[in-house]
Amino acid sequence: AILISNVSAEELTDIQISSPIMDKATISNEAIEEIDTRNAVDGGDLLKNINGVNAIRRGGHGLEAVIRGQSDARLNTFLDGAMVYGACSTKMDPASTYANVNNYDSVTVIKGTQSVLFGAGGPGGIVSFKRVTNPVTKPEYSIGQNFDSNAGAYTTSGNIVLPLSSSSYLRLNGSSSNAGNYETGAGIKPLTEYSTTDYTVILGTLLSDGSKLEFNYSNNRQDKVGYPGLRMDIAYSYTDMYTMKYHKVTPFGIFSSLNFELFNTDIDHLMDNTTLRGTTGNGSMFTPTSSDTYGGRLIGKIGSSMRAGLDYEHNTKNAEQNMTMMGSNVFMAYLWPDVEAE
């Protein structure tokens, strides 16, 4: 037996921990043309140049943004107000890959759960690409060309804003990007080629009270995107995005201003191991997938700093894996069996 004759207790002092609610390092709102980058191929490639944002690279295109160690669906990603979820079950197409940076004006990055203005979830943070368009008195246009000699990559982009009246406008922009397989110092050419095209049509007007109404349609096409570290590549990935935005600048009840937005995003995606790698006989695989999202949000401003509102989003995903065996297509498994999330 063990006997303890002296027992005493020591009183510890209190420990106080304090932290500021938010600082400037948590929120980044930058004009895209001012971000220090070299021919960013997509939104993820651009984001990695912002302090506190990293990226996962699987090929020449489709870089996946990482904020505070979190990525994919743990980041809420918006393209001009439309919530976007990638359609690939192996994360070949993170949402930011559908943002061609030549066709957007600014990007906002919020690190962590610092705001509820951009929907539920998103513990890693928020990424929001935006276009800002206002009425013009005469046509405005710009044309750009980028080239990268290593992979033979080039991007051609254009933007034009036309006045329809003193208060209405039409904006058209688009781009086309192509790249081959770059060559390493050892003479190896990894499968990193890609081909993308996209365009956007924006129709907007200022109302008599100064409020703004805008309709957007965006189309993004990705073809033959190689991923050397994965078992398959993107054969195609086609996206249609629709948004309607209304900003009321005059008081309405207790609100000094209102923002109302509706959006719909449809993505059809096919990955296989034959389009870029050639026929593989009985080992050929193909996986068609889709990701469709719709929703909206209403936000009212009260006073100078308070906001109140509501938002809704609905996402449906489908994915099935198939193989070719003995010359016949054989269904293997459902990866996303009509999965719904709200």
Question: Where is each model-derived feature located?
Answer:
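Face-selective signature of the C-terminal outer-membrane beta-barrel domain
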Residues: 206-220, 239-342
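N-terminal periplasmic "start-of-domain" segments of outer-membrane beta-barrel proteins
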Residues: 12-44, 64, 72
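Periplasmic-side early beta-strands and strand-to-turn transitions of outer-membrane beta-barrels
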Residues: 128, 136-138, 144, 155-237
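Structural signature of outer-membrane beta-barrel domains
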Residues: 22-24, 72, 84, 132, ...
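Short acidic/polar hinge/loop motifs at secondary-structure boundaries
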Residues: 55, 83-111
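Extracytoplasmic beta-strand/coil segments of soluble accessory domains associated
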Residues: 44-83
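N-terminal periplasmic accessory domains that precede
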Residues: 34, 43-46, 63-66, 78, ...
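Hydrophobic, lipid-facing positions within transmembrane beta-strands of outer-membrane proteins
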Residues: 63, 123-125, 139-141, 154-158, ...
